[in-house]
Design a protein with these regions (language model features):
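Enriched for short, Lys/Arg-rich terminal
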Residues: 1-8, 12, 68-72, 76-109
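Conserved catalytic core of Hanks-type protein kinase domains
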Residues: 27, 43, 76
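Arg/Lys-rich, positively charged N-terminal/basic patches that mediate binding to nucleic acids
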Residues: 1-39
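Short, intrinsically disordered, mixed-charge
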Residues: 30, 41-45, 107
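Residues that form or immediately flank small-molecule/cofactor binding pockets and catalytic motifs
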Residues: 20, 59, 91
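Amphipathic alpha-helical interface surfaces
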Residues: 32, 36, 40, 50, ...
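A short, surface-exposed loop/turn module that caps and links secondary-structure elements
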Residues: 41-66
Length: 109
């Protein structure tokens, strides 16, 4: 797992990526990455957004969606250690990003 500290300031949660999610992050286009980065910084202050809560196997996870670009970022909030853990980042095509997130969630200790 890779850690990214929140920018200096009053951020409460730290950001971490699963290794596969970090690879996906690094492969993103610069403009998509910048948009997601800005949204993630806001989520580090308040990660529990009711409208972004997922269901089913991902019921303890949340999403950030970029409608125009078609990307989704799926994360889990670990309140006990104040961490936002990114599980997957990809296009929504065929729900692949959600399937990846479920698989990674099941294999994550």
């Amino acid at each position: 797992m890779t850690n990214f500290e929140a920018p200096e300031g009053s951020k409460k949660y730290r950001l971490k990526f699963l290794p596969a999610a970090l690879e996906e992050w690094h492969s993103l286009d610069g403009s998509v990455k910048l948009t997601l980065k800005n949204l993630l910084q806001k989520r580090l202050e308040n990660p529990h957004i009711p409208g972004a809560k997922l269901q089913g196997d991902l019921r303890n996870c949340y999403k950030i969606k970029l409608l125009k670009q078609g990307y989704r970022l799926v994360y889990q909030v670990e309140d006990d250690v104040l961490v936002v853990l990114v599980l997957a980042v990809a296009k929504r095509e065929d729900m692949a990003v959600y399937h990846s997130a479920v698989g990674r969630l099941l294999s994550h200790p």
